[in-house]
């Protein structure tokens, strides 16, 4: 695994992605939690192929600003760039954009875990 790994995830805003549907607001605009989930998805996919067999990553923290609204039917992208590696802790810069430019930005932390050991914690 190396600094600079990048992935961009894409989403077309559907009714289920709106703040009024997600319960995070009462307007028909992209919900902040949906934007943040797309950021997490991009980070997860940025490093997926670099992990050893049986390993995955889990989200640990996200700090994000939602800067501009996005309407129903518009396409958004979220790009994650791996900026730091400290043992199992991975740090990403995340940016969300639509056709008008940047709509959100922040930092996301993920942790490398063994799938089986992590899921065993549910027992």
Locate the predicted segments by residue.
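Catalytic strand-loop segment that frames the active site of acyl-thioester-processing enzymes
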Residues: 1-30
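C-terminal binding/interaction regions
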Residues: 2-8, 17, 85-92, 101-122
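Hydrophobic beta-sheet segments that form the core/acyl-binding groove
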Residues: 64-99
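A structural signal for short, well-ordered beta-strand segments
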Residues: 7-11, 62-66, 80, 94, ...
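Hydrophobic beta-strand-centered segment that forms part of the acyl-chain substrate-binding groove
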Residues: 44-77
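Generic helix-packing signal
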Residues: 43-47, 84, 98, 110
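Conserved N-terminal beta-strand and adjoining loop/helix that marks the start
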Residues: 33-36
